[in-house]
């Protein structure tokens, strides 16, 4: 008689116990996994918010109010997407700080892919912040996009192209919404590359202990 239930349980234990990670890592190594959880939450809530959002300067703010008041569980989705973005940045800054402290930047491919991820994430957050088209988000869109004019020769042309005209208007909001929607999928692709590069090289050994002691 063979107890297949116990065998499958043992295989599951073996699967988790043979992960290529030594016991010399600490709680600071959790934040990569937490970032993936944040990315999943943001993508799901963002999708449902995009269904009800209207990318029009006259209707954007009203559509946010509509999501919060009229859509079933809309206020949860809206708050989760907003607060989740803050959690995303808290996790990524701790993740980076751990990398700097323990010398993870020596793994150049992983570090450069992570830097690209951070820049893409900051751009995504900016485009998302602008979407309600309230007083603060309109001001932020004006001030931050105007920074492009500081680029020699190309600055004014780039700003006009991003605005979709000579001032911030309806085409600007439409472009920002399109960019905010597509960038998370680019982040997912970059995250996959980041993880593959890490697993190709392996994590560092901060305490210099024998990784086979387990």
UniProtKB/Swiss-Prot annotation:
Residues binding heme b b562, per UniProt: 81, 180
GO biological process: mitochondrial electron transport, ubiquinol to cytochrome c
Binding residue positions for a ubiquinone: 199
Cofactor note: Binds 2 heme b groups non-covalently.
Binding site for heme b b566: 95, 194
Segments traversing the membrane: 31-51, 75-96, 111-131, 176-196
Record's subcellular location: Mitochondrion inner membrane
Keywords, sorted A to Z: Electron transport, Heme, Iron, Membrane, Metal-binding, Mitochondrion, Mitochondrion inner membrane, Respiratory chain, Transmembrane, Transmembrane helix, Transport, Ubiquinone
Any one Gene Ontology molecular-function term assigned to this protein's record: ubiquinol-cytochrome-c reductase activity
GO cellular component: mitochondrial inner membrane
Function comment: Component of the ubiquinol-cytochrome c reductase complex (complex III or cytochrome b-c1 complex) that is part of the mitochondrial respiratory chain. The b-c1 complex mediates electron transfer from ubiquinol to cytochrome c. Contributes to the generation of a proton gradient across the mitochondrial membrane that is then used for ATP synthesis.
Miscellaneous remark of the record: Heme 1 (or BL or b562) is low-potential and absorbs at about 562 nm, and heme 2 (or BH or b566) is high-potential and absorbs at about 566 nm.
Record note on quaternary structure: The cytochrome bc1 complex contains 3 respiratory subunits (MT-CYB, CYC1 and UQCRFS1), 2 core proteins (UQCRC1 and UQCRC2) and probably 6 low-molecular weight proteins.
Family statement drawn from the similarity comment of this UniProt entry: Belongs to the cytochrome b family.
Protein name: Cytochrome b
Natural source organism: Bothriechis schlegelii
